[in-house]
């Protein structure tokens, strides 16, 4: 029997962010982007900061995840996110300013500096948040 939909639950430390029936999702795993469809083999993996693309029957939704854990069962997908943010909750000016400041800091550093990786991650997070803002403007 072919399964056409499954339940997705996205939960952060603070609250439930999304709960509903979906057709598929795309999320950034530690090995790259994962496409998860109903009936997928069981999976437990870490997720990296990036976009969660949710495809429902009649609409799509996008969230920013700062990382977390993805559990997949054939009929239920659960994401335990460190932080999950909807586009409407992001301040585009703040995100752009944060990205610009981080880029200025990193230009003054050398690759061996302790904070180089931390600031690189901040830039990656800002880029993902800006992608989310752009996707929801369309």
From Swiss-Prot:
Subcellular location, record wording: Cell inner membrane
UniProt xrefs under CDD domains: F1-ATPase_delta
Record key words, sorted: ATP synthesis, Cell inner membrane, Cell membrane, CF(1), Hydrogen ion transport, Ion transport, Membrane, Transport
Membrane topology: Peripheral membrane protein
Domain of life: Bacteria
InterPro entries given in the database record: ATP_F1_dsu/esu_C_sf, ATP_synth_F1_dsu/esu, ATP_synth_F1_dsu/esu_N, ATP_synth_F1_esu_C, ATPsynth_dsu/esu_N
One GO molecular-function entry: proton-transporting ATP synthase activity, rotational mechanism
One GO CC annotation: plasma membrane
Principal location class: membrane
Family: Belongs to the ATPase epsilon chain family.
Quaternary structure, from the entry: F-type ATPases have 2 components, CF(1) - the catalytic core - and CF(0) - the membrane proton channel. CF(1) has five subunits: alpha(3), beta(3), gamma(1), delta(1), epsilon(1). CF(0) has three main subunits: a, b and c.
Job of this protein: Produces ATP from ADP in the presence of a proton gradient across the membrane.
Protein's UniProt name: ATP synthase epsilon chain
Species for this entry: Blochmanniella floridana
Lineage of producing organism: Bacteria, Pseudomonadati, Pseudomonadota, Gammaproteobacteria, Enterobacterales
């Amino acid at each position: 029997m072919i399964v056409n939909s499954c339940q997705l639950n996205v939960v952060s430390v603070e609250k439930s962010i999304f709960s509903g029936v979906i057709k598929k999702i795309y999320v950034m795993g530690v090995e790259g982007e994962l496409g998860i469809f109903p009936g997928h083999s069981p999976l437990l993996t870490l997720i990296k900061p990036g976009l969660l693309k949710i495809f429902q029957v009649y609409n799509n939704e996008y969230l920013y995840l700062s990382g977390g854990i993805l559990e997949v069962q054939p009929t239920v997908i659960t994401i335990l996110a460190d932080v999950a943010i909807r586009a409407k909750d992001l301040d585009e000016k703040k995100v752009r300013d944060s990205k610009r400041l981080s880029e200025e800091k990193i230009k003054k550093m050398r690759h061996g500096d302790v904070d180089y990786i931390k600031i690189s991650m901040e830039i990656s997070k800002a880029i993902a948040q800006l992608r989310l803002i752009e996707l929801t403007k369309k």
